[in-house]
Regions:
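Conserved phosphate/anionic-ligand binding catalytic regions in large, soluble enzymes, centered on
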Residues: 73-89, 307-324, 365-369
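Flexible, glycine/charged-enriched surface loops at secondary-structure junctions
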Residues: 55, 97-101, 142-147, 169-170, ...
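Early transmembrane hairpin of solute transport permeases
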Residues: 81-180, 184
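Hydrophobic alpha-helical bundle architecture
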Residues: 91-93, 119, 329-342, 352-418, ...
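A structural signal for small-residue-enriched, beta-sheet-centric alpha/beta enzyme cores
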Residues: 74-78, 108-112, 119, 196-200, ...
Length: 480
C-alpha cells in the first residue's frame, strides 16, 4: 500500500480520519462525535506522555524472531503437508523408491487431514494421498512447500498407489497432539522419520536400526524463541516502536500471498464458497469484506488450491484470519503502509501469544485466537489504547470462545467468518465502552488472565472433547 499524496500543507485522508480516534465518544440525538488527533506520537515511537519508548533489546530481538519463525509460507493445509514432508524425507533417507509406506499419527493429525484436499493432488484427500504424493513427487528440502514441484504424472501415480493400498496409517495414542512417523520400506531395508510438536520439526531419523539423527523434543535450537515473553502490553509497545525494516520482509510477504489466495477464493468456486456468498448476500461494506476475504482464502486453501499462504501458529487458516481483515480495514481507513505493518505486528503476535497456551493442535478452533488478533489490530488502527485493545480481545473470547475444531475442511471458512464477525463486534462494543465483566464465564480480571483461561480450556478442558470428535470421525463410537 502506498501513502496517498497530499497537497502541501494538507493531511492525507488517513491523517484526517484515523490516527488517533479518541475513545470518549459523545452521543447526542443519535449523532456520534469523534474527536480526532494526530498520531505522530505513535509513528515517532513516543508514548502518550511524549517519552521515547524503548523495549529491552533481548525482548525486541525475541519478538522479531518470533515473527520470522512463525510467518513462513506453506503450500496447502499444513497437516497434510507435514505428512508429505515426513514421507518425502523418509524416502530421501532410504535412497530408493520404497515398496510401501507406513504412517503412524496422532489423533489431531488424522482429524486435520481426513477431510481436506491435498494440494497439487487434483482433488484427492487423505493421509495416504499426502504421504504417497510426498514420496512420488515431493522435494523434502522445500519443507512446507514440499509439494510445489509435483507433476501431473506424479498425481496419476499417487492415485494408482493409493487405490492399491500402498500406504497404511494407524492411530498413535498417548503422544503429542502433533505427532507423525513415516516409515518407508524396500526389501529388507527401511527408513523412518519422526516429527513432533511443529510441522517441520524432525526429532528422529532412523535407517535400518541405526539412529542417524535425534533431537530432544524441547531442544533449544538456533531457531528457538521464548514465547513466554509475549504479553499484550509489550506487544503494543513493540508494535509502536519497532523499526519497520526489521519486519518488513515477513509482513510484505504475508500481505501479498494471503491477498492473492483471497482473490483466488473470490474468483473461483472453491469449497462451500463462504467468502463469495457473504459478498453476494450482504454487500461489500468493510465489515463484510473483512470476513469475506478471510473466508475466501480458506475456501481456496481447504479446496486444494496450490497457492502458498503465510501461516500463523503453524496454520494457513489462522495466517489468513490474522491478516486479511486487518488489510481490509486499513484500506478503508486510508492507512499508510507503515500503519498497516504496525497493525499486522499486533494481530500476529496477539494470536501467537494466545496459541502458546492452547498448543499447536487442539479441539479449540484456532480461528478464534486468530480473530482475537485481527480484532486487536483493528482497534489499534482506530487509535485504541491498551485498555481498548484488551476489551476487544476479551469481548471476542467471551463471544465465540467455545467453537470446536473438528478437522480441516470446507467449514473452516465459515468458522473464520463467524470468528472475525465476533472480533469486529468486540471492537465496536469496546468503542462504546461495553465489555464482558470479570466472573462472567471464563472472563478474568484482566486480558492476560482471560487469555490464560481460554488456553486452559483449549489445552486441558477439551482433551476428551478432542478424543470424542475423532471417535465420531473414524466411526469408533455409536452416536444415538
Amino acid at each position: 500500500m502506498k501513502r496517498q499524496k497530499a497537497v502541501s500543507g494538507e493531511r492525507t485522508p488517513c491523517e484526517k480520519r484515523l490516527f488517533c480516534i479518541c475513545w470518549d465518544i459523545v452521543e447526542k440525538d443519535m449523532i456520534v462525535l469523534l474527536i480526532i488527533k494526530n498520531n505522530n506520537d505513535i509513528i515517532n515511537n513516543m508514548n502518550a506522555n511524549g517519552e521515547k519508548m524503548i523495549l529491552d533489546k533481548k525482548l525486541y530481538d525475541n519478538y522479531v524472531k518470533i515473527l520470522e519463525n512463525e510467518l513462513v509460507p506453506a503450500l496447502g493445509c499444513t497437516e497434510p503437508i507435514a505428512i508429505a514432508y515426513a514421507a518425502a524425507k523418509a524416502r530421501e533417507v532410504l535412497g530408493e523408491f520404497p515398496d510401501h509406506v507406513e504412517m503412524r499419527c496422532s489423533g489431531n493429525i488424522i482429524k486435520n487431514v481426513k477431510g481436506v484436499t491435498v494440494p497439487n493432488s487434483d482433488g484427492q484427500r487423505g493421509i495416504d494421498v499426502a504421504a504417497i504424493l510426498g514420496i512420488v513427487g515431493g522435494d523434502a528440502s522445500r519443507e512446507l512447500e514440499v509439494l510445489e514441484s509435483v507433476k501431473q504424472e506424479d498425481i496419476e501415480k499417487t492415485r494408482e498407489l493409493a487405490a492399491a493400498g500402498y500406504c497404511t496409517c494407524t492411530l498413535q495414542e498417548d503422544v503429542a497432539n502433533l505427532y507423525i512417523v513415516a516409515k518407508v520400506c524396500k526389501g529388507g531395508h527401511y527408513a523412518e522419520v519422526t516429527i513432533i510438536n511443529r510441522h517441520t520439526y524432525i526429532t528422529r531419523i532412523v535407517k535400518d536400526d541405526v539412529v542417524l539423527f535425534e533431537a530432544a523434543v524441547s531442544e533449544e535450537s538456533s531457531n528457538y524463541v521464548d514465547k513466554s515473553l509475549l504479553n499484550v502490553k509489550d506487544i503494543l509497545e513493540f508494535a509502536n516502536t519497532v523499526n519497520i525494516d526489521d519486519v518488513r520482509e515477513v509482513l510484505k510477504r504475508q500481505i501479498e500471498m494471503n491477498s492473492a489466495i483471497a482473490d483466488e477464493g473470490l474468483m473461483h468456486p472453491y469449497g462451500a464458497q463462504i467468502g463469495r456468498t457473504l459478498l453476494q448476500v450482504y454487500g461489500d461494506d468493510v465489515k463484510i469484506r473483512a470476513k469475506a476475504r478471510a473466508a475466501a482464502g480458506s475456501d481456496a486453501r481447504m479446496g486444494g488450491c496450490s497457492m502458498p499462504v503465510v501461516i500463523n501458529s503453524g496454520s494457513g487458516n489462522q495466517g489468513m484470519t490474522v491478516s486479511l481483515p486487518v488489510i481490509e480495514f486499513a484500506k478503508s481507513l486510508f492507512c499508510t503502509e507503515e500503519q498497516l505493518y504496525r497493525a499486522l505486528v499486533v494481530s500476529n503476535l496477539v494470536a501467537i501469544h494466545q496459541k502458546k497456551y492452547i498448543g499447536s493442535l487442539s479441539a479449540y478452533c484456532g480461528a478464534v485466537s486468530a480473530a482475537c488478533g485481527s480484532g486487536a489490530a483493528i482497534t489499534y488502527l482506530y487509535g485504541g489504547t491498551y485498555e481498548d485493545i484488551s476489551a476487544t480481545i476479551v469481548n471476542t473470547i467471551g463471544n465465540v470462545g467455545g467453537i470446536v475444531c473438528d478437522g480441516a475442511k470446507s467449514s473452516c471458512a465459515a468458522k473464520i467468518a463467524s470468528a472475525v464477525d465476533a472480533a469486529i463486534l468486540g471492537h465496536f462494543l469496546g468503542r462504546k465502552h461495553h465489555w464482558f465483566q470479570p466472573g462472567e464465564g471464563i472472563v478474568q480480571k484482566d486480558v492476560e488472565g482471560t487469555i490464560k483461561s481460554m488456553g486452559y480450556i483449549g489445552r486441558v478442558g477439551m482433551k476428551d472433547t478432542d478424543k470424542q470428535i475423532l471417535n465420531i470421525m473414524i466411526d469408533q463410537v455409536k452416536v444415538d
